[in-house]
């Protein structure tokens, strides 16, 4: 595959919803141009684990003539709290950031979620550019304009829609990504295969070894295909009024697992179990064939992703699912499949149906 950057366009209903997702290598030197001439001050938000990377981005911006600062936040989901957002707001205020200044997020999905939320709320909206450093961040969190923080009541219950000005997915950053993080991100890639692009599933099934090599052409193609799926969906439905709900395949139970586990589970692992549950639910109501449901099990297991969860946690999971944003009143709603790349919605008035499907994945 070519070393040239691939540009995937996200288009929306207004000019502020249009942006490029750039996939390639050595993309840091393109950041100043993406920020534009009007920006003077830039806050680089990064997690503790990426302090050196954050400093490198800051130094690059300083060399290009920007006034650049860094804000270091806790790693992973620990960074997605209102207190962390308040810390970032304080830094912005103390350094006189105006509406024409910008934020750059450097890190995984949790960092882009938090930085996007800070950008959306500071002065009711400033420019943000995402530089995702994890597979999960590249294919999911950084694309689509969703921002959010967690509360004691659940994940991403507080947030807004705030599309970035650009996303720079630098594949070089994946070279140092821990294997379990790579596997976690693959769950979101697989999700895109099941809801929209069967070629993703074929690639994974035929190239299991290459899928675990972040430098391979296969991984790059998987990333570009997954981003293209999400870009196409959010271009049609930014604010999740209809079509965008399909991107939540596996997430209703997945988010409930994360809540029950107090966010100690990786997002992709929880979504993997959630997809297996959704497949069993789809099968149980006659919407998904045995072969397609079993294909979930085979593909997810081949990557080392979990497909079962504890039998004794059902009530806690049910409570968590009732807080899902797709719910309408007391009615639980799930993204299900009528076949590969044929997503739909199932409204479930009777939780006994859910319990029966859960027994198929309970351990």
UniProtKB/Swiss-Prot annotation:
Q: How and how many cofactors are bound, per the record note?
A: Binds 1 divalent metal cation per subunit. Can use either Co(2+) or Zn(2+).
Q: Give GO BP annotations, semicolon-separated.
A: amino acid biosynthetic process; aromatic amino acid family biosynthetic process; chorismate biosynthetic process
Q: Tell me the CDD domains matching this sequence.
A: DHQS
InterPro entries xref list = Dehydroquinate_synthase, DHQ_synth_AroB, DHQ_synth_fam, DHQS/DOIS_N, DHQS_C
Binding-site list for NAD(+): 75-80, 109-113, 133-134, 146, 155, 173-176
GO molecular function terms here? 3-dehydroquinate synthase activity; metal ion binding; nucleotide binding
What cofactor requirement does the entry state?
Answer: Co(2+); Zn(2+); NAD(+)
Q: What class of enzyme is it?
A: lyase
Cellular localization per UniProt: Cytoplasm
Q: So, what pathway does this thing act in?
A: Metabolic intermediate biosynthesis; chorismate biosynthesis; chorismate from D-erythrose 4-phosphate and phosphoenolpyruvate: step 2/7
What are the alphabetically sorted keywords of the record? Answer: Amino-acid biosynthesis, Aromatic amino acid biosynthesis, Cobalt, Cytoplasm, Lyase, Metal-binding, NAD, Nucleotide-binding, Zinc
Q: Which reaction does it catalyse?
A: 7-phospho-2-dehydro-3-deoxy-D-arabino-heptonate = 3-dehydroquinate + phosphate
Check the record and name the Gene3D superfamilies matching this protein: 3.40.50.1970, Dehydroquinate synthase-like - alpha domain
Q: Which GO cellular component terms, listed alphabetically, does the Swiss-Prot or TrEMBL entry include?
A: cytoplasm
Q: What is its EC number?
A: 4.2.3.4
Q: Which cysteines are joined by disulfide bonds?
A: none
Q: Where does Zn(2+) bind?
A: 188, 251, 267
Q: What does this protein do?
A: Catalyzes the conversion of 3-deoxy-D-arabino-heptulosonate 7-phosphate (DAHP) to dehydroquinate (DHQ).
| HAMAP family linked to this entry | DHQ_synthase (MF_00110)
Protein family membership = Belongs to the sugar phosphate cyclases superfamily. Dehydroquinate synthase family.
Q: What is this protein called?
A: 3-dehydroquinate synthase
Q: Which organism is it from?
A: Paenarthrobacter aurescens (strain TC1)
Q: What is the lineage of its organism?
A: Bacteria, Bacillati, Actinomycetota, Actinomycetes, Micrococcales
Which gene produces this protein?
A: aroB
